[in-house]
Amino acid sequence: MNGKKKEERRVPKLRFPGFTEDWEQRKLGEIADIVGGGTPSTGNPSYWNGEIDWYAPAEIADQIYVNSSQKKITDLGYENSSAKMLPPGTVLFTSRAGIGKTAILTRKGCTNQGFQSIVPHRGELDTYFIFSRTEELKRYGKLVGAGSTFVEVSGKQMAVIELMMPPTMREQQTIGCFFQRLDNLITLHQRKCLYMF
C-alpha cells in the first residue's frame, strides 16, 4: 500500500446507461441567473389590468407549469417597478414565507418581490433538471433564510447554493425528462382519482 487515499469518484449511485463522467460541484449562480421581482404602485390604476403576467407566491401551489397569472400589469406598471421580465423556462422560486414553492413559466412574465426565480443559462442548466431539485433548494432556502419579520432567502444566498451536477447537458436533459414523465404520470393518475369520487 502506498499510503495514498484512493480518490473518491463523484458519481450518483443510480445512473442512466451511457454516462460515465464524474459529476461536478457548481454554484447555482454560475449556471443560472437569480432574479427577484417587484410590485408597481397599487395606488396607480394605470399600472394594473394590462397584458403582462405578474405572479404572487399565493398562485404557486402544486402545479408544475404556470401560463397565466391572476393579476396582470401594464407596460407602464412594468417600467415603473423593479419587476424583471422572465423568459419561458424560468423556474419561479418563492423566497418568503412558504419558501421553495416552484413552478415553470411557459410564457414570459414577471413576479412580485416574493420570488428569487431561476433563469437557466442556455447550454449549462436544463429547466426540468433544476426543477427536479426543488426539495434540495427548498431545504437550503429554509436553512439560510433569515429575517426579523419573517424568513426570507435572498438572491445572493440562492446564487451560492452548491449542487452536484452532471457535466453534460445531455445527462441533465435525460434526468429532467425522466422526472417530467414521472410527474406527468402522477398528474394523470391524480386526475383519474378525482373522477372516481
Predicted features and spans:
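Histone-fold recognition with a strong bias for associated Lys/Arg-rich disordered tails
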Residues: 9-10, 44, 159-160, 174, ...
